Design a protein with these regions (language model features):
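Repeated scaffold domains used in trafficking and secretory/extracellular systems
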Residues: 49-59, 99-107, 150-160, 205-213, ...
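An edge-strand/N-cap motif at the start of beta-rich repeat modules
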Residues: 33-90, 368-369, 386-410, 417-419, ...
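Short, conserved, GDST-rich strand-edge loop motifs in beta-rich repeat architectures
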Residues: 271-281, 514-525, 574-591
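Residue-level signature of beta-propeller blades and closely related beta-rich strand-turn architectures
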Residues: 71-73, 120, 174, 225, ...
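A short loop-to-beta-strand structural motif that recurs across blades of beta-propeller domains
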Residues: 77-79, 122-124, 179-182, 228-231, ...
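Blade-level signature of beta-propeller repeat domains, shared across WD40, Kelch, NHL, RCC1
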Residues: 703-734
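Surface-exposed loop and turn segments in beta-propeller and other repeat-based domains
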Residues: 43-45, 92-98, 137-151, 193-205, ...
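Conserved beta-propeller blade signature
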Residues: 66-70, 113-116, 167-171, 219-222, ...
Length: 734
């Protein structure tokens, strides 16, 4: 600690004593705060309904056609479905716990193995003939040649395609742009080989390659999110050409969700969420060489898929297939581009079931599944019959949900906790804690479909912010918690652009401040004021928000509000850095901001840059002393609202890092408890030391399970999650 200079004349001995004391005050380490509590693991949480974005198919060694249905989540749950008998053949965990499995697309190799592109960033090879516990192999592993050179490009895998040589292509999303990675399973004596097909990325400025299709030596890639386009790649030379796609095809799209190519036709999905007919009815038919729209008899070829999902079928040279509601009946349709007509192949499919690119296992057998309820539809084409799966031997659903990582958590008056998971679900997790851990109770009340990004509540209202619809859903608060039976909702913006309501903070009993980010994250977010009593919202995008001082204009552009506190008629809001928040060479111009917003004038009144080298102000809280405390994951700071200055700060040189994601910070009895760098840390509001890690992340061979979603329970304990499990930190009695 720095001490003030002395002005008195000291004796020599006094000077020596004083110098020694001063030296000790500077060099002696501060004693780290230890709350003296203990961590308790609550019982295993029940999984929500299955998350099944896509399914695969293959044929077993004995000739049996099967569906490969993976429920996404923590480790995933693999179901093998017999398509002949329409029964469940087996169910087992796909891979070990702490592996994030999100089954976005499948493709089948000539050896009948199934490749799974996972949103967790892995490529899995599945052999359904293998013994239990040995069916899946994670190919995204440093032991595979070339993987370490491409790992940074595979944060998320969206799609997968294979060529006639069994080379596998995956579409990726990363902070280094969207890439196409190629995996050759036969290279290096069967050890495989990873390569980056187009070094430098597919399209400058795009973080995603969203869709792939392969045909006759050429790979087609659909990009997003700023300027969606289609790239045609010669897989022999890796020469890439951007197709001249008509602007009407991509107008209004944030990405190209589905491509399919068959018999000289390139099918491009154009579905935009909403109630209006999408361009081309959902799928445009283009020339795969030029990108021009295909015509027949003077009319553009269009397919009324609505959902953009077009798939091919073994043994069919030209026709493609899709599902659609016809006269309120879910049907499987066959489209013939030679006549530009469709016919019904089967009726009575599950209403939420949608096809995947490998839905046809054979010319006879088709399977589809509902993304958020795993409602299965199995079609036998010869008789046009469509049926689901019977219940399993225990009377439960044949397709069951996998444990999923908890990503949002809140505590409400009355003692209950409410949580939501990564990936959308039509329910919430309600937890009723008990002093005896084994008496904790769980339930899964129904709620609007979505991924809850943030919770907020007052004495009168309980509010959830859900992705991808960008809606706020409000419920009345009862004596024992929210009354979930009745709810109303409102979109933050009519076009659902602001799709991630991360921060929801009460202003008074009826009003909430909301900080939202765009669906695809880069770009400006928005600050909203939500009137729950009247279900009305006023939204202020940060790129057009009003300033009391014109000289501040533009300082918040290209940033997203991640943390908010309310104090005496003002909001204090912490933002991300500009762009995607991942710039390692952050400058003053691109750094995260802390700003003050006047609720009366609805204008930004003050803006500061606390740290230019950080990625986000991930959490803010109001202390009992009226001080605003915040963190970036690497720094903790105290800000005085009166003069809008940083009074003190502490760099977390041990076990800290500059985080980009929102977190939580709570002040209790002069101690800050916050999630920083994936750990729960306790430190004094004096910020004299780095504090103590009271709950660390868990390390397993599959990876780390970070601490997240902190809440202060009605019982005075801290509750938080690691993976799919909830924990609490109990303070000493008294």
């Amino acid at each position: 600690m720095k001490q003030s200079a002395r002005t008195t004349i000291l004796t020599l001995w006094g000077a020596l004593v004083t110098a020694l004391a001063l030296s000790l005050s500077i060099t002696a380490p501060a004693v780290a705060l230890d709350p003296g509590g203990r961590e308790e693991a609550l019982p295993t949480t029940p999984p929500p309904d299955p998350s099944v974005p896509s399914i695969g198919t293959t044929v077993l060694s004995d000739g049996t056609p099967v569906g490969i249905v993976v429920a996404g989540g923590n480790g995933g749950l693999l179901h093998v479905v017999d398509l002949n008998t329409r029964t469940l053949r087996s169910r087992e965990r796909l891979v070990p716990e702490n592996t994030d499995v999100q089954p976005w697309e499948f493709a089948t190799l000539s050896n009948r193995h199934v490749m799974l592109a996972s949103g967790g960033g892995q490529l899995f090879e599945i052999d359904p003939d293998a013994p239990e516990g040995q069916k899946a192999t994670n190919l995204s592993d440093p032991s595979r040649p070339g993987y370490e050179q491409v790992a940074a490009y595979s944060t998320f895998l969206w799609d997968v395609a294979v060529d006639e040589h069994d080379r596998v292509y995956v579409a990726t999303q990363s902070n280094h742009g969207g890439h196409i990675l190629r995996y050759d399973p036969s290279a290096n004596q069967g050890r495989g080989q990873w390569t980056d097909l187009l070094p430098g990325g597919v399209q400058a400025g795009e973080s995603d390659v969203r869709s792939l299709a392969y045909d006759n030596g050429f790979l087609y890639a659909g990009t997003g999110t700023k300027n969606p386009s289609i790239v045609r790649i010669n897989t022999s030379t890796n020469a890439a050409t951007r197709l001249a796609v008509p602007s009407r095809v991509t107008a209004g799209l944030s990405h190209l969700e589905r491509l399919q190519v068959k018999a000289g036709n390139l099918y491009v999905g154009t579905n935009v969420p909403g109630g209006v007919r999408p361009t081309c009815g959902g799928t445009c038919v283009l020339d795969p060489v030029t990108g021009a729209q295909k015509m027949k008899d003077g009319k553009a070829l269009e397919v009324d898929t609505w959902s953009s999902q077009v798939v091919t079928r073994p043994g069919e040279a030209e026709k493609v297939y899709y599902t659609v509601q016809s006269h309120n009946t879910p049907t499987l349709q066959e489209y013939d581009p030679r006549t530009n007509t469709s016919r019904t192949l089967a009726q009575g499919l599950a209403c939420t079931a949608r096809p995947s690119q490998s839905s046809w296992a054979t010319h006879e057998h088709f399977i589809s599944a509902g993304k958020d309820d795993a409602s299965i539809a199995i079609v036998h084409a010869s008789d046009g019959s469509a049926t689901g799966l019977p219940q399993d031997a225990n009377g439960g659903n044949a397709i069951q949900g996998s444990p999923r990582d908890i990503q949002s958590l809140t505590a409400v008056p009355g003692g209950d906790l409410y949580a939501s998971w990564y990936m959308t679900a039509p329910m919430l997790l309600r937890t009723t804690p008990n002093a005896q851990v084994d008496k904790t109770q769980y339930s899964l009340p129904q709620a609007p479909l979505g991924q809850v990004e943030g919770f907020g509540h007052s004495s009168k209202w309980f509010v959830t912010g859900i992705y991808p619809s960008g809606e706020l859903v409000r419920y009345e608060m009862g004596a024992s918690g929210p009354m979930l039976e009745n709810h109303q909702s409102v979109r933050i913006t009519p076009d659902a652009r602001q799709a991630r309501p991360y921060a929801i903070v009460p202003i008074n009993d009826d009003e909430f401040a909301v900080g939202a980010s765009p669906k695809n994250k880069p770009g400006s977010g928005a600050l909203s004021i939500y009137d729950a009593a009247h279900n009305k919202i006023d939204t202020y995008p940060l790129d057009t928000i009003s300033y009391a001082d014109p000289s501040l204009r533009g300082l918040l552009s290209d940033r997203r509000p991640l943390s908010i506190v309310h104090h005496q008629g003002k909001l204090y809001v912490g933002t991300s850095a500009s762009g995607n928040g991942m710039n390692p060479d952050q400058t003053e111009a691109s750094a995260p901001r802390l700003f003050e917003f006047d609720l009366k004038t609805r204008k930004v009144t003050r803006v500061m840059t606390p740290f230019k080298d950080q990625r986000s102000i991930t959490a803010l809280t109001l202390g009992s002393d009226g001080t605003v405390y915040g963190t970036t994951g690497m720094h903790v700071f105290a800000m005085s609202p009166a003069d809008f200055t940083i009074g003190r700060s502490r760099a977390l040189t041990r076990q800290g890092y500059a985080d980009a994601n929102r977190s939580q910070l709570i002040e209790r009895d002069g101690v800050l408890y916050g999630i920083m760098a994936g750990r729960l840390r306790a430190l004094s509001t004096s910020l004299q030391d780095e504090g103590t890690v009271i709950a660390d992340f868990a390390t397993t061979p599959q990876g780390k399970a970070y601490v997240n979603s902190l809440a202060l329970g009605a019982d005075g304990s801290l509750y938080y999650a690691r993976g799919s499990r909830i924990y609490r930190y109990r303070f000493p009695a008294g």
